[in-house]
Amino acid sequence: MINRDNKKAITKKGMISNRLNKFSIRKYTVGTASILVGTTLIFGLGNQEAKAAENTSTENAKQDDATTSDNKEVVSEAENNSTTENDSTNPIKKETNTDSQPEAKEESTKSSTQQQQNNVTATTETKPQNIEKENVKPSTDKTATEDTSVILEEKKAPNNTNNDVTTKPSTSEIQTKPTTPQESTNIENSQPQPTPSKVDNQVTDATNPKEPVNVSKEELKNNPEKLKELVRNDSNTDHSTKPVATAPTSVAPKRVNAKMRFAVAQPAAVASNNVNDLIKVTKQTIKVGDGKDNVAAAHDGKDIEYDTEFTIDNKVKKGDTMTINYDKNVIPSDLTDKNDPIDITDPSGEVIAKGTFDKATKQITYTFTDYVDKYEDIKSRLTLYSYIDKKTVPNETSLNLTFATAGKETSQNVTVDYQDPMVHGDSNIQSIFTKLDEDKQTIEQQIYVNPLKKSATNTKVDIAGSQVDDYGNIKLGNGSTIIDQNTEIKVYKVNSDQQLPQSNRIYDFSQYEDVTSQFDNKKSFSNNVATLDFGDINSAYIIKVVSKYTPTSDGELDIAQGTSMRTTDKYGYYNYAGYSNFIVTSNDSGGGDGTVKPEEKLYKIGDYVWEDVDKDGVQGTDSKEKPMANVLVTLTYPDGTTKSVRTDAKGHYEFGGLKDGETYTVKFETPTGYLPTKVNGTTDGEKDSNGSSVTVKINGKDDMSLDTGFYKEPKYNLGDYVWEDTNKDGIQDANEPGIKDVKVTLKDSTGKVIGTTTTDASGKYKFTDLDNGNYTVEFETPAGYTPTVKNTTAEDKDSNGLTTTGVIKDADNMTLDSGFYKTPKYSLGDYVWYDSNKDGKQDSTEKGIKDVTVTLQNEKGEVIGTTKTDENGKYRFDNLDSGKYKVIFEKPAGLTQTVTNTTEDDKDADGGEVDVTITDHDDFTLDNGYFEEDTSDSDSDSDSDSDSDSDSDSDSDSDSDSDSDSESDSDSDSDSDSDSDSDSDSDSDSDSDSDSDSDSDSDSDSDSDSDSDSDSDSDSDSDSDSDSDSDSDSDSDSDSDSDSDSDSDSDSDSDSDSDSDSDSDSDSDSDSDSDSDSDSDAGKHTPVKPMSTTKDHHNKAKALPETGSENNGSNNATLFGGLFAALGSLLLFGRRKKQNK
């Protein structure tokens, strides 16, 4: 937790422990600003933050009251009007800068990573190194093993100080950005130490700086309280006479003091156990900069803010660990290697967990302290700030950043944006600070000269130990670096086929040509400025500058360094482009022991939890009242974080470390089996109960009156009765018995089953030991029973149905009953008969068919019964419930299914499959009928002799449709004229072939006229072969052969007229006495309906008559009648011929 109101006072007075220094490096330019480097922020810890800026202008320091951050770097931006000069020869961005404008200095609002260790080491890069190969590990508490004494010095910096630095370039013109990759280096920073005096085993008493207090290392190790006392004394020292730094008109940094080293005894190691599975993440967010566009302007110091909130399970123990993961493309710090995360503390300053950072995996591992053993229901939140890792992201791109708390991930899409070079004419340049080494007091700057690879003439580059404006003019002021012959200046040439990373950060200089030696005679120094004469160039160059700086008189960092490029145009005029980088520091305070002003007093709250036997809400009014142990009490801080304790054996609890003026909330967990007692039962605040939750504000004193009382919750019963409702009226009658062994289930208001029982021999059931509340009772229907009607009468005499709700309110509830009656059973079946007349109706003369298999299926299609008809054709299925069924009849062999649904349900045939629904009654209407098919054969063979000429006229009616083709040879002349009309109700198709010259085709309602002219001898032999097919509702196939032989001795002319009219309707075989012998073979086939007809038994329709079957006999009669008529006319013609002779 951060005490924002006391931030300035904390900075001015006393020692502040657990404070981290953060540095942001600013780029000042007309219209642009950029910041490098990132840090982490963790709630509850302070940090000291530094900014680096570029360009000239007066600045007003602005204090920011950020709460908790970890190695955060932020930069102020100065935006001026700019114009763009297009140059397509290089992919680097172009930025045009106009007049320089004053820029207000901003101090970062985000705190940096808190150092856990008391001894911080720093690494310095004085020569080009391949940072890619470095593996900088978090610093450790080396002081615990050092044989050194502790020296507390008045006016020195707080311990555990981390410096985190970022850079911002500046110049006058914006051009295309470079596209070559860039790298990032982390440097662990430490403030300059005062010149040490050689002192062994001494501690300087802060109250008397001139007289050291002799304390041995062993004494400090064995007596940590002594160390705390020394620190406390130093914190209480009056610093009022110490001059306070006044912010100048340009830059007013705060003091960054030398580190103090303490030898502290380390606790015994505790076995580590990852408990990520016991960490519940409640909220995670990722925000880039202001969160409006998700653009990470890496040179403008736009940070990536990761916020996470989580709870710590009560199973977590001291020594257990959890993890926080950064995305692989970000780093907590850009200019330093100080990536050690600060401790997670609660608002009172107690440490919950200590963290270490693994640079290779970019993972923080937090180890829990004994805080988790003392407190319960801990809620924590963490805010981590990081920055784009220029080593893994050398150029502008789009990323999907992923962070994770305890393995639970969240992601955000981000666009990475880098700065533009400053351009004016052919002059184009850009620069950033890349590394800060506070131990050696050096700062590294990397400069891109002519990154656009223009053809520049008379090129000179100035490196100034102060800011420069956009015209290259040096602006003297605070924070000057030292630029002289001892300044390390390296120059590298970029080949034409190489592209500079847009990140403006080089990690491996070996890939470029080192041309430093070429400038031995082209480099001059004057007035803290180095000038390099490049002459006429068309290539890009990199300058790496490592310069010394001198801290300000109060020990704070104030670093500024500028660079400018000047060229001449074709008219001989100079074009300037400049960048400035500078660093300033600001202080942020956070949670922890060191963040509290020495003079600030902390307070406590608490008191007592008791069992209020008489429920009056007043303590001590009943001798049976007693304290309640192990009651969970939770304190919620103003920032929403919580911690919990349990009452001791005397019912007491206490929370300390609370601040005056702050408002807190205390909540009491109601113990199982108890209820909260009456609130404010008396005006005596020391004796009343404050209820389950109370809010309190600290008003300059402790508050030990926050009490609460509970009483045991009474228990109740619920239940009643299950009976057989024989008359089905839903009312419990005196003569109706209970039903035993009925299952009853009890559920609470959430639907959770809390009990199951069965009724006893008298139908009674009961659930006991129940609290007030709403319950649900479910009755299981007994086998063979049906639920009766419900809610028909008074509550204690009716049936509540299968499911009912029961309410207990300070009394038993014995009114939940349910009634059932025995479920009736039904039968299904009827009759299978021989339908001799095929009309689909059961006639009295028609008999049943025995042994027909009948199958019964339920609604799911499952076979539930199979039977056979008895000798009378009867069948039945019994013991059936109401429902849907299907009856399937198996067709007997040799029989045909009769027509279905021709009359009433109980007299018709229902077909091979019948669907039926039983609803509270039997159904004996499911019948089916079958009949046997007819078949006939006849052969006809005739032989006749005739000797005559005849004229024949015949008229016949026929119910058939036939095609006839006959051919005959004869030694006589005959004329035949036949006229026939045919009208039939059926269609018959017959085909006959005969050897004659006549062709006859007749159809129903047809008029045919045929002429036959034949010449026959008295001796003739005729052979007739006809084949006819008839197809209607029946199939008829007949085959007849006719052989006739006639002799004649003369040739005569005869004119005879005979009329033959035959009309026959016959269903029989006939023989005729003549000289002809007829043998015919005919087959008759009658089509039948399918054997299985599936339809609803209660929806029958009468079938239409089968006309073709009924009229087949008439067709046969007509055919035979026609043959007899022909024979008769031949005989008659023969007699007349003989008479003429």
UniProtKB/Swiss-Prot annotation:
A GO CC term assigned to this protein in UniProt: extracellular region
Keyword Magnesium found: no
Ranges where the CNA-B domain occurs: 602-714, 715-824, 825-935
GO biological process: cell adhesion
Pentaglycyl murein peptidoglycan amidated threonine carried by residues: 1107
Motif LPXTG sorting signal mapped to chain: 1104-1108
Topology relative to the membrane: Peptidoglycan-anchor
Biased composition (Polar residues): 158-207
Superkingdom to which the source organism belongs: Bacteria
NCBIfam families per record: LPXTG_anchor (TIGR01167), YSIRK_signal (TIGR01168)
Descriptive protein name: Serine-aspartate repeat-containing protein E
Species annotation: Staphylococcus aureus (strain MSSA476)
Gene: sdrE
